[in-house]
């Protein structure tokens, strides 16, 4: 049966209206790894301010060049406590800000000592941070996991090496399909090790400072 012209117009307008309705964008899933040096402490403030825009799967403290282990300073816990004070006001603008208790529950320590700057798999010891990355890459959530290396990438290298060595080929394939590594230059040997030994992993390097202190992008 041929549809009347008026009915055709109504159907067309209805479909057009549906297509014009904005779809809720899926939040990117993020694990941030940080060395706790002063630039990262500043970045963490901004990270928390924008935490309504992404799904925080983990915050992992990793190695830096200035001293052994910033985790003992409890600087992230202090920042999250301040975030909790601001949370009621933040949620007036966006209800999607995560609970402070949740952020503390996904906080872990990775390979954070300066000596780990010079170690590579399989010489790195296991860590809570590596296990958090492993659990996230192997869980049932199919979304990509954007692992942001503000400091070194040895903890990420350690986690990926463990998955490839200790888990099934199917689980390794799942990890490969989900992992998205972003490195703010290779601050230890981990990023280059992943690039050379696990070429199937998607990895981006942002660049390194030149002698004038400027940043050049090599992504």
Task: Outline where the language-model segments fall.
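N-terminal acidic, glycine/proline-rich low-complexity segments
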Residues: 21-219
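Bacterial N-terminal signal peptides that target proteins for export
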Residues: 1-8
């Amino acid at each position: 049966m041929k549809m009347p012209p008026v009915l055709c117009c109504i159907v067309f307008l209805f479909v057009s209206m549906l297509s014009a309705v904005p779809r809720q964008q899926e939040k990117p899933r993020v694990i941030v790894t940080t060395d706790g040096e002063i630039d990262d402490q500043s970045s963490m403030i901004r990270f928390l301010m924008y935490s309504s825009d992404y799904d925080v799967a983990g915050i992992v403290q990793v190695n830096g060049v200035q001293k052994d282990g910033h985790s003992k300073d409890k600087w992230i816990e202090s920042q999250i406590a301040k975030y909790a004070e601001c949370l009621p006001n933040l949620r007036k603008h966006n209800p999607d800000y995560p609970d402070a208790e949740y952020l503390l529950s996904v906080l872990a320590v990775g390979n954070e000592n300066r000596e780990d700057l010079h170690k590579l798999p399989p010489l790195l010891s296991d860590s809570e941070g590596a296990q958090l990355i492993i659990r996230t890459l192997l869980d049932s959530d199919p979304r990509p996991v954007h692992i942001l290396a503000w400091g070194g990438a040895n903890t990420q290298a350690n986690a990926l090496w463990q998955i490839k060595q200790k888990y099934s080929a199917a689980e390794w394939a799942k990890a490969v399909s989900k992992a998205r590594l972003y490195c703010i230059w290779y601050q230890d040997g981990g990023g280059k090790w992943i690039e050379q030994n696990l070429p199937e992993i998607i990895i981006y390097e942002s660049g390194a400072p030149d002698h004038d202190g400027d940043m050049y992008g090599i992504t």
